[in-house]
Amino acid sequence: MIIKRDYYLQQLISSKSNNLIKIVTGIRRSGKSFLLFNLFHNHLIETGVSEDHIIEIALDDRLNKNLRDPDVILQHIHERIVDDKLYYIILDEVQMIDEFTDVLNSLLHIRNADVYVSGSNSKFLSKDVVTEFR
């Protein structure tokens, strides 16, 4: 059974291109990844966004372990951005990146990027993270 999560999807849609990082938080296995990688991804495709302008990285996937290095993930993302059109960057379990707040701050400097992240542990949910973006 698929739970549509219309309310949360609408929150993401209404926050598109606002020059802020959109953060989806919650306990593990609560549907954050499904919301971003399926529901929001499908919305982007349905509204005309090209697949190659959606950069999705699941950092809890062992195959992406090398991308947990801040320099490696930033280089990977920059290599995928090849034109001036808007790119949607979706990072799942972002707290698995070393120095993830520095990475997120760096992503804010990409003019043609709209950034969405999820996280689920106490390190990511800490109020201290919020102060990093003031």
Positions of predicted regions on the chain:
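Phosphate-binding site recognition
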Residues: 1-134
